[in-house]
Regions:
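A short, acidic, amphipathic alpha-helical segment used as a generic capping/interface helix at domain edges
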Residues: 69-75, 206-222
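Short glycine-rich or small-residue beta-strand-to-loop segments that form or flank ligand, phosphate
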Residues: 82-89, 111-114, 128, 228-233
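Internal, active-site/partner-interface "lid" segment
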Residues: 133-200
């Protein structure tokens, strides 16, 4: 059995980054003014942010079926008979199902793991899978490990403007309804408990209270300094740094990394969003 490990740009990394690690990465598509472009390879992160500032209507979609098929056919010609895939989660995209369909059409074995999220967690899982396979760990043990990562990770979103998420259908009906209430700041989360959909964790009146509610939630989960903490933002660096400092001041020993939020996600959360990702497995998901 020869296995090819496959992901997509929902990880927040350019395909070339994954190529160096021996992992195949397909680009998600971003559409603006009727034209679809491959994320990172045909439209840059800064270009996406600029279009958001210009109030352009942006949409995202899974990698083109043609590109998935071309990739898998090339892998089959190179002697691979199995695809091991960790793409963006099913709750946000049909990528996983499309990959499985095309692998089946090409009579290749398919192992797909739902990350129930995207970005850091997704990248962590595909890289962990590749490393474990190279260490001769059985596939069923690899799957169990990835499932444990998905079970234990927590991702919480604070959005200034929910219009983008409502337009894209990335919110559950309850979350969308709350977004329309005057002065309400829903605290949103995504993970296995929400089946990979963005849902409401709580609702508060101000962004400060929203941040305080997130920190309270982490303490309720017994999150401590042994966890990985990452704050990802959509063109809101100052706000993200302040949020990170608040977390570090209230969770003893916590060290928070600040990064840009994946463009294909930022399109739906809108400018000003700050996302907090935590994981109890820093060696796997840092």
């Amino acid at each position: 059995m020869k296995i090819a490990f496959v992901t997509d740009t929902g990880t927040g990394q350019h395909p070339d980054y994954w190529k160096e690690k021996g992992i195949y990465c397909l680009p998600l598509q971003i559409t603006c003014d009727g034209e679809s472009k491959d994320e990172y390879t045909e439209i840059t992160y800064s270009e996406v942010i600029q279009k958001l500032h210009e109030k352009k209507v942006l949409k995202t979609s899974l990698p083109s079926l043609g590109k998935i098929q071309d990739c898998f056919e090339e892998l089959k010609n190179e002697g691979y008979d199995t695809i091991f895939a960790v793409p963006i989660c099913r709750g946000l995209s049909g990528t996983l199902d499309s990959m499985e369909m095309i692998a089946n059409q090409l009579e290749m074995k398919f192992v797909g793991v739902d990350c129930y999220c995207t970005a850091v967690e997704q990248g962590c899982m595909i890289e962990t899978a590749k490393k474990m396979y190279e260490a001769n760990i059985p596939i069923d043990e690899i799957i169990k490990k990835l499932q444990s990562i998905a079970d234990s990770c927590e991702t919480v979103l604070l959005c200034d403007d929910l219009d983008h998420m409502k337009r894209g259908g990335r919110l559950t009906p309850m979350a969308a309804a709350l977004g329309g209430l005057l002065k309400i700041k829903p605290v949103l989360h995504i993970g296995k408990s929400t089946n990979g959909k963005v849902d409401v964790l709580d609702k508060v009146r101000t962004m400060k209270r929203a941040q305080d509610r997130v920190i309270k939630h982490l303490k309720e989960l017994n999150v401590d300094s042994n966890y990985t903490f990452i704050v990802a933002h959509v063109d809101a660096l100052d706000a993200a740094k302040e949020y990170a400092q608040k977390i570090e001041s209230q969770i003893e020993g916590a060290k928070v990394k600040v990064i840009n939020l994946v463009s294909a996600v930022g399109i739906h959360t809108g400018l000003g969003c700050c996302l907090l990702y935590t994981s109890p497995s820093p060696r796997d998901c840092s």
